[in-house]
């Protein structure tokens, strides 16, 4: 007889581990455990049977894979967390003794960790990193829009803003933007980078009211990881396109209006060395640290060495396989129509229009930008330095206002109009980009009622404001003719209908005997006969649905009911919107 196995030593109890057990095994605090899991990409798991995984207990706990926790035991960052705990004790002891010299020495030698090896582990290829930077970009743009506070330092905000501007400058220069959508949350952008669609959200630059219930420790951990990831991605993109990284910063433009025009993207052929930032030392926070650059360069060189080693392998006697070159995708060029939409235009942007959004889109599609805000900044600087006022002629010559073809304004009426300019509202830029062609400007003239601004990634089954509602109104009228719903038909209704037909037949016989015609109003309607046939078919379909539901499990039934509920809700909402639209159109006709 074989030995009896102990309980909870195999299966789910062996494959899963609770969070408390994981923290005890790693010998770290809960905060450090969370940071480590975020860095390594480890997240809680849901076992099929929580009772078996928790060794018979039904207490609510969080589970992780035991192999994931075992994998964390050999992480170098874990050792740095332990060293930091020792460092904090030494620093507290020195400050308690009042030994400031010793405290300063300890603080200078604080343990520091790097995430470059984690980036290479989680993203073995550059394409893997590109497919996963959507959330990273959205997070960095969010922190770039936040005000500096006790939770978020000014250094983090400025660093996030610098990375975001470097990204926008690269995407605009290479003309990679494909779609844009302005929503209540912010502006969604979509770019095609090496065949990968990258989408990110840029919040509006409004004063932010930060809620008190936000856990900034978790968000700052994600920010730390995403910052390192984007440093590597940006270095790779700039390097592959032959550009100097970090880009040169024009301190004059940066101190003024700023934006992507303040970043000068220069080719490495024209620059022998990596340039330094122009301007004072306060702007040096915009630069990427030399350590990050050296790590990115080493990582890039390491990849090249690996490729060379793979090429040196002798292929004698090896089978040859035709591998699909998934990463070698055609990159769009300037000759494509996608990046040349505004190439023949010089667009003047009014001061009431958000400059950062419109300027980025126009430059990304080949246009030239002249902003009224930059002109105001120049006038203010001249007034402060020289004490004189720039005349209109000098201003026109400096900004070449005679070449302006379009002016974007967000005002209902304009006092003066310059001859030769086409005046449009900002939505014309967004809709033209999404359509891939220049739309007629008559619908977007100042003061005109704008068409619906729809998401270019919208679902096909949802309500479409641009669709014609005439077909929908005809369907509604047909539905009104059918008075009886399928579920209201029963045997009593069939008996009443048979009696009505018998009475009608009796009337026809009496009319023939008298030599007159029967009353057509008393005849049964064809629509009702059609309804009878429709209801029989629907009845059969309903019975088939019920039979199929009998074969479902309880879990499948609940899921099916949820799906039906959401579909009914969408259809009701769509019908309500169509009804409102018809009422509005009737009012406009009156």
Swiss-Prot record:
CDD domains recorded: BRCT_pescadillo_like
Disordered: annotated span: 297-318, 452-590
Subcellular location: Nucleus, Nucleolus; Nucleus, Nucleoplasm
Coiled coil: 489-589
PROSITE patterns membership: BRCT
UniProt similarity note: Belongs to the pescadillo family.
PANTHER family: PESCADILLO - RELATED, PESCADILLO HOMOLOG
Protein name: Pescadillo homolog
